[in-house]
Design a protein with these regions (language model features):
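Short hydrophobic/aromatic beta-strand micro-patches
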Residues: 264-268
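A glycine-rich phosphate/pyrophosphate-binding beta-strand-loop-alpha-helix module
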Residues: 72-143, 147
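Amide-donor transfer/coupling interface in amidating biosynthetic enzymes
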Residues: 285, 393, 397-398, 439-442, ...
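N-terminal beta1-alpha1 cap of cysteine-dependent amidohydrolase-like domains
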Residues: 298-454, 458-469, 483-491, 498, ...
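General beta-strand structural signal in soluble alpha/beta enzymes
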Residues: 46-48, 61-63, 102, 139-141, ...
């Protein structure tokens, strides 16, 4: 069982996936890994379609299929199963099987003899057979016949991508949800030539889809390499649920067999399969438990052992965590509570929010949408730096827009490609221009304005001294900084942060002790400062948020503290709280997103900033 989970085509690739930003665009319906532990991989991508104004529930679905071991044995079967796998994974996410299209990507060795010419030919026949039987067409693709270098060749490769559009409210994730729920297996029979019975498969897909859109199914996993055993194990990990197979379970060998077109299905609310799947064949597998064990006849396997076997194989190549180093004493500081909400001395119905976009920034659309949804007027300006004249013109425009706004927002991204020796330097250099610096000082000190920096914007605020000092100053030896993540790479995931202090207008709508699930995506987010300076900031209520574990305790340990920030610091403020810098992308959430992640995801930062001017 454990050896099966440790195979390279079965084991976790989470450490690789986290290198890629999964939440940009404010449309991620399902995170790549779901459950409270974020360990169960999602069957594919579900994201709302991007719109400049408002919100849509229309979401795109994309799922892939390919098994290199099958393709090496038979390119025909490899391509046929690839189409089937991609379609099944799309249906498992909520797609209608009658509204799926495909795109195929092919990659084969150099075609220098009769045998190698037969590989793409047989693969295309297998793919066409599956498409014809499922009544699903491939409407695009790409191919390459250059997969040979000296004596090295790629396996015969035809990767199928299934694409569809769904209502994001109907999207369903892979991790098991609730103890007590029944779990079944739906199979697609194969003949003596290992060809799938497509008539049965089409019926299975339609019946399963109807159950999903009727909210009768809690989770669905597609059988891939590793068989039912791997599917059940991985689906348990997300929420630390155990599984008890029916007793006796006699056909244990079938648990490890590749069964293309098969599904593991968790029924919702203790429903019985007889009520939902009377028209198709299925097998009762068992039910979910709170035991943190997988029980098969007289054998019990702990989830701890399963987790270790599943995560360990690629940990040295694509690590998920690194040692946090020496423990920091007094990391758990008292909460700082401001008794009265902080408000502006004047009222503006729709405050203007100026969002300058520097080269490499990519969060301006998400940020503008968040402020406008809260009632503000977002004004986005793209800084031009192609020539000296354009830079000067951009600075003049920035001065005018700062003088005309109530809120200055520095969004996240990768300013100047996160240039060497620290990101955010280009932004900080621009803001140290005398005219811009005077405009910022006027906004903050004379007009009681607000300033917010997220991710790259936080890095710029730190380099300018706006946090924690409240004004643009030269950096001192003991000034806080943000440096490279302890793990030495980009990290994209959801973390939990706790409100430590509400001494800021940006936190008027939350209470100290509140915990939120927030997206992070950065390579340089590790907060560092001398211990005396950190304690001074705590005492002054300027440490606004900390990374916390599943028990709500501040921690230095990954993955809860994704970058190794000292004292688990995620966000800090200026002395008066009107300038706030944080790493987590609070702007990337709207209701209906990140459905496979637990917790309160609305930090109410943007509504707090806008309502400050009521």
């Amino acid at each position: 069982w454990l050896a099966n989970l440790s195979r390279l085509n079965v084991c976790s690739q989470k450490g690789l996936s986290e290198r890629f930003d999964s939440t940009i665009g404010r449309g991620t319906v399902l995170m790549p890994f779901g459950g409270k532990n974020q360990l169960t991989p999602t069957e594919g991508m579900v994201a709302r379609l991007p719109v400049l104004k408002g919100i849509t529930n229309a979401a795109s679905v994309m799922a892939c299929g390919y098994n290199p071991e099958v393709a090496c044995w038979s390119p025909f079967h490899g391509a046929m199963y690839a189409v089937v796998e991609s379609v099944c994974r799309a249906v498992a996410l909520g797609a209608d099987p009658d509204k799926i299209h495909l795109t195929l990507q092919e990659y084969f060795p150099k075609l220098n003899n009769t045998e190698t010419w037969g590989q793409p030919f047989s693969a295309l026949l297998g793919a066409f057979m599956a498409q014809d039987a499922l009544k699903i067409a491939a409407i695009g693709g790409k191919d390459s016949m250059s997969g040979t270098f000296m004596d090295k060749t790629v396996p015969p490769t035809l990767v199928s991508f299934a694409v569809s559009v769904i209502d994001s409210e109907k999207a369903i994730s892979t991790e098991f949800k609730t103890a007590g729920n029944n779990v079944i297996f739906i199979a697609a029979p194969r003949d003596e030539h290992e060809v799938i019975d497509f008539e049965v498969l089409r019926k299975n897909l339609r019946v399963l889809h109807q159950a999903i859109i009727a909210n009768k199914v809690a989770s669905v996993g597609v059988i891939k390499e590793g068989g039912i055993a791997a599917a059940v194990s991985v689906m348990c990990l997300g929420n630390s649920l155990g599984f008890e197979f029916i007793k006796p379970f006699n056909d244990t060998d079938s648990l490890f067999t590749l069964q293309p077109g098969g599904f593991v299905v968790e029924l919702a609310d203790g429903l019985s399969p007889e009520d939902l799947f009377a028209d198709i064949e299925y097998i009762n597998l068992g039910h979910l438990t709170n035991s943190k064990l997988i029980s098969l006849n007289e054998t019990e396997i702990t989830l701890d052992n399963i987790t270790s076997a599943y995560l360990k194989p690629l940990e040295t190549i694509f690590p998920r965590i690194v040692d946090a180093g020496a423990k920091v004493a007094e990391i758990n500081q008292p909460l700082y509570k401001e008794s009265l909400p902080l408000t502006a001395p004047y009222s503006i119905a729709k405050p203007r929010v100026f969002i300058p976009v520097f080269p490499g920034i990519n969060c301006e659309y998400d940020t503008a949408a968040a402020f406008e949804a809260a009632g503000g007027i977002a004004e986005v300006f793209v800084v031009r730096n192609l020539t000296a004249v354009e830079i000067n013109d951009s600075m003049d425009t920035m001065v005018k827009m700062i003088n005309n706004c109530q809120i200055l927002m520095l969004p996240g991204g990768f300013s100047a490609g996160d240039e060497p020796d620290g990101s955010g330097k280009f932004i900080a250099t621009m803001f140290r221009n005398k005219k811009i610096q005077e405009a910022v000082n006027t906004l903050l000190q004379e007009r009681d304005g607000l300033m917010l920096g997220i991710c790259n914007g936080f890095q710029a605020l730190i380099k300018l001294g706006l946090v924690p000092y409240g004004e643009i100053v030269d950096m001192r030896q003991d000034s806080p900084t943000l440096t490279f993540n302890k793990i030495g790479r980009h990290v994209s995931q959801i973390v939990e942060t706790k409100i430590i202090s509400n001494k800021s207008p940006w936190l008027n709508f939350v209470e100290p002790g509140d915990i939120h699930s927030i997206a992070v995506s950065h390579g340089e987010g590790r907060f560092y400062a001398p211990e005396a300076e950190i304690k001074r900031l705590f005492a002054n209520g300027q440490i606004a948020t900390q990374y916390v574990d599943q028990n709500g305790a501040p921690t230095m340990q990954m993955p809860f503290n994704p970058n190794g920030s000292l004292y688990a610091v995620e966000g800090i403020t200026s002395p008066d709280g009107r300038v706030f810098g944080k790493m987590g992308h609070s702007e990337r959430y709207v209701p209906g997103l990140m459905k496979n992640i637990h917790g309160n995801k609305d930090q109410k930062i943007f509504i707090s900033g806008v309502k400050y001017f009521d």
